[in-house]
Amino acid sequence: MFVMFIVAEVDDEVCVKREVERAAGEVGVHVSLTPFQRREKAEKNLYVVTILGKDRVGIVRDITRAFLDFGINIERTSLTAREELISIEFLVDLGQRDAAEVRKRLRREAERLGLDIVMQPYSTFNREKRLIVFDMDSTLVEAEIIDELAKEAGVGDEVSKLTERAMRGEIGFKEALEERVRLLKGLPVEVLERIYSRIKLTEGAKELVRSLKEAGYKVAVVSGGFSYFTDRLKEELGLDYAFGNELEIENGRLTGRIKGRIIDASEKARIVEEIARKEGISPENVVAVGDGANDRLMIERAGLGIAFNAKEVLKDVADGSISKENLVGLASVLKLPAEFRKKV
């Protein structure tokens, strides 16, 4: 006995049914025609997951195994390398899975493997980014500048403890900042220049900013630190915008007070929105990069939020987490054209 199933799309159901039955009768076979309602494919829930880290044997295997364990389908994969740094881009379908939970699980697995991870919706990934905003301390520069000022003032331990508590979100930023600045009262203004001359840019920061500028980005630093240093960074790196808290100075010494409005988390987010509005850039086209609790709101509201060498409180709300060694990996995450990525 021979049985054949055929699925066909027809324009005139009645005419086709009559002709098929006639032809079947001529060759002596039985035919049964049943209307078939095509089931629409489930809409895909696509995300782009970018893995960054030092190249080693087994990275692709380890990550694909993690996707398999989580039941996530990989649509496609691409890989680029720059010296020791490798960037692997996965297009994945999350299906009905919760993106925040998947991101958290993948981040933990990536950290276990010594890798960085950024996960963003495919729709966001495909959207051209036009503004990138960096925090300053421990992001564009390696130091926490207020701690360096405190050492010069002989109050290093006290200020460092307050800084750590503020970074973890244990005390309010304004409260912590005002208390730390109060401890700097009487510090000569010449110390600020001395500190700026010795702080180091984060590895790759200068090259990354240059490539971002050449690729057409507006680049800003918005910091809860001090405007003396953000203004100097703007000049050195050719940034478009720089915002920081202004230290009050009288007779060549710090008064222990801040002039004007304090830039805390909500003020940072407001400034980012103001820059975007001024430049005619939508929030979805904004990238925010920071390391502490004070960066939380601007990272949550940006189209792409990156926790850089950050505390857990920030990693949990960011789209991705990048370690200190991989700042240049942002060029891959942002899909800068190849000619610009080569310069980073």
Curated annotation (Swiss-Prot):
Metal-binding listed as a keyword: yes
Residue ranges annotated for the ACT domain, each copy included: 48-120
An individual GO BP term: L-serine biosynthetic process
Highest taxon of the lineage: Archaea
Active site: D135, D137
Cofactor note: Binds 1 Mg(2+) ion per subunit.
Cofactor requirements of the protein: Mg(2+)
Keywords associated with the record: Amino-acid biosynthesis, Hydrolase, Magnesium, Metal-binding, Serine biosynthesis
Name assigned to this protein: Phosphoserine phosphatase
